[in-house]
Amino acid sequence: MTTVAIVGGGPAGLSTALFTAKNGLETTVFDTDGTWMHKAHLFNYPGIGSVDGSVFIENLRDQVNSYGTEREQGIEVSDVEGTDDGFTLRTDEGSYDAEYVVLATGANRDLAESLGCAFTDEDVVEVDVTMETSVAGAYATGAMVRTEEWQAVISAGDGAAAALNILSNEKGEHFHDFDVPDDADRVFGDLVDDD
């Protein structure tokens, strides 16, 4: 059983994988390579002046691979159902079990519907601020939760929010993924008020 199963290999799914795998959770991404990023060129992603969408996705894949993410490339998830201890994902190749599932399938909301997630009046998946759906342990991100406001940077943020909530649940306390250089105290001083 994997800890986190992510359905979708675009900005939201790979962002989730980056945070969860980097922080030690066993993570599997099911990626059919159907991301809209292959039709995009990014000029509006903070910190990146300009990048082809396909290059951006390849860079993200390399990054999540470096943290040990298991990527099931080309495998489509046909169904997700809740179990007593998480979720079962079904594919043509077999079944996979996970403690958490993150749905990052763009505007395709079929898996969320079959899982029993609540929808809003606008027919998008209803989530809280952590991207968790009405089904405990199931998260939805990106275009699944918005009618029109689809941007790579928003989707990546959704994936990060889902990942941080999963990490907080697993660690039993609020979790933040800050990478601090070893010499931060020397460079920046003591930024923590002990009072």
Locations of regions flagged by a protein language model:
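A conserved short coil-to-beta-strand element within the FAD-binding core of flavoproteins
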Residues: 73-86
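Helical element adjacent to the flavin cofactor pocket in flavoenzyme catalytic cores
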Residues: 53-71
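Haloarchaeal acidic low-complexity proteome signature biased toward cell-envelope/secretome components but also
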Residues: 1-3, 14, 18-19, 172-195
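A conserved FAD-binding loop/helix module that cradles the flavin
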Residues: 141-185
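Short hydrophobic core segments
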Residues: 5-7, 95-107
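Beta1-alpha1 glycine-rich phosphate/pyrophosphate-binding loop at the start
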Residues: 2-55
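A structural signal for the hydrophobic beta-strands that form the central parallel beta-sheet
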Residues: 71-73, 103, 140-141
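FAD-site-proximal beta/loop scaffold in flavoenzymes
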Residues: 22, 107-148
